[in-house]
A protein has these predicted regions:
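Short acidic DE-rich linear segments
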Residues: 99-104
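Acidic, low-complexity, intrinsically disordered interaction modules
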Residues: 26-97
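Negatively charged, low-complexity tracts enriched in Asp/Glu with abundant Ser/Thr
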Residues: 2-31
Length: 104
């Protein structure tokens, strides 16, 4: 179960990624959208954090960011923009289909 403190921390991460999304120029990066998804497994209470980049043309890149600090998330975004992480798509889709998405 997400505690109020945990929700506050996750909200900061979501808002950080939203703010970065607003300043990443699509014409130079081909990034259509950048977002931070949080899911909760209602059975175990465990939460999953994913950084998601949707590219112009339909490609997607996913990165698990469970427990990462904001500075590490920033580094992950840089890595995703440079080369991407496609191997975590299956994990993301399993979590997305089996867990409740937390809305901020």
């Amino acid at each position: 179960m997400l505690t109020p403190e945990r929700i506050k921390t996750l909200s900061k991460k979501v808002n950080f990624v939203k703010a970065l999304s607003a300043v990443i120029p699509a014409y130079q990066t081909n990034v259509e959208s950048l977002h931070y998804d949080v899911f909760e497994d209602e059975e175990t209470g465990y939460d999953y954090e994913y950084l998601v980049i949707d590219y112009v043309g339909g490609a997607h890149s996913y990165r698990s960011c469970n427990g990462n600090s904001i500075s590490v998330i920033f580094e992950e975004i840089a890595g995703m923009l440079d080369s991407g992480y496609y191997e975590e798509e299956r994990d993301y889709n399993v979590v997305k289909s089996s867990c409740r998405k937390i809305k901020f």
